[in-house]
């Protein structure tokens, strides 16, 4: 049996790569997170540089005190906020909504959840093997 590829299927996949990720902050406020393909070269490079900052955060040990864990959590939020300033249409509103969470660990998890959703939804993926 041969595989049949349709232009419509290709179109759908290509459009998905260029579509923004929409994050609803409230009933009337939505923030768009632009995919890397829609960013200019300087902005793309800046996003990559921001992600390199994660290497500067030391690994946590099981016996680290709560204050240190909270400090690292806030560092994670600061790094991800830099990325949001580059990719979001309304970065101040997005960051303000995330910063409403008072617990630094939960806040860091929220930041990471939004970032990971953006990464997952806008990934470029790998080329599919050609049918032989």
From Swiss-Prot:
Q: Write down what this protein is called.
A: Tail assembly protein Gp24
The species is Mycobacterium phage L5
The entry's keywords: Viral release from host cell, Viral tail assembly
> Subunit composition?
Interacts with tail assembly protein Gp25 and tape measure protein.
Q: Which gene encodes it?
A: 24
Q: Which InterPro entries match?
A: Gp24/Gp25
Top-rank taxon: Viruses
Q: Per its database record, what is this protein's job?
A: Promotes tail assembly by creating a scaffold for the tail tube proteins. The tail assembly proteins Gp24 and Gp25 would wrap the linear tape measure protein to create a tail assembly scaffold. It would allow polymerization of tail tube protein during which Gp24 and Gp25 are released and therefore are absent from the mature virion. The tail assembly protein Gp25 is produced by a rare -1 ribosomal frameshift. The ratio Gp24/Gp25 is important for proper tail assembly.
Q: Which family does it belong to?
A: Belongs to the L5likevirus tail assembly protein family.
Pfam families (alphabetical): GP24_25
Q: Which GO terms describe its biological process?
A: viral tail assembly; viral translational frameshifting
């Amino acid at each position: 049996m041969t595989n049949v590829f349709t232009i419509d299927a290709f179109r759908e996949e290509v459009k998905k790569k260029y579509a923004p990720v929409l994050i609803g902050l409230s009933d009337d406020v939505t923030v768009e997170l632009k995919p890397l393909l829609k960013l200019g070269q300087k902005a793309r490079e800046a996003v990559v540089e921001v992600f390199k900052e994660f290497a500067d955060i030391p690994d946590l040990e099981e016996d680290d005190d709560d204050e240190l864990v909270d400090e690292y959590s806030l560092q994670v939020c600061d790094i991800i906020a830099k990325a949001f300033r580059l990719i979001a249409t309304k970065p101040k509103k997005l960051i303000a909504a995330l910063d409403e969470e008072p617990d630094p660990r939960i806040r860091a998890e929220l930041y990471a959840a939004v970032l990971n959703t953006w990464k997952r939804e806008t990934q470029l993926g790998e080329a599919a093997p050609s049918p032989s």
